[in-house]
Amino acid sequence: MENERCLDLKYAKLSKAGEIIEMLCICLGVFLIPLFLPKLLTIVFGKTSVIASNSQYVVGSVVNTLLIIAGVNAKGWKKVLGIVTLPSISALFGGLVLKASSVYTMYMIPAIWIGNFAIIYLYRYLFVKKNLNYIVTSAIAIITKCAAIYAGFNLLVLVNIVPNGSKVFTSLNIAMGMNQLVTATIGAVIAFGIIITMKSKKVSE
């Protein structure tokens, strides 16, 4: 019975100290990963490697994993707000994830915040509170996040902040569209593995 319901349960019940440590780790992760992971991948694999040249997919996948874990196990909306805002702030200051298009990140920040909040909120509300199946929750949360961010991008195009047909448009169209869908999906898969692992560990104890 436990295995049958493992998709509908939180992965762990932490002590107060454990919750604080978990949230600190997540906050540090979502801030530092966009800032330093691309450079690390370049050093380790080389600038022209497939992994380093597509570092935004690696960064986005890890950040989405942390956002989902926060949605499943975080307590208190004040903590969540920090987790929602830190990745885009890190990307803005580092100028790493979107590279040449990073100057436009500041215009996308509100949409990214809304998207990040949506994925955390929906996992918390649907998966944790309503016990909805993880896969269904993931589909709803990922689509909502991607729609919010891509809508923000299209608004910038509509008001001509991002010129339609330009190189910046092409870059951001991918970064705020397909990139978001791919990285959120990968993040959901990784988070699922973490949740199941922690749940299995809890059951065995």
Go through the PLM ranges and name each one.
Residues 1-205:
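Loop-helix junctions at membrane interfaces
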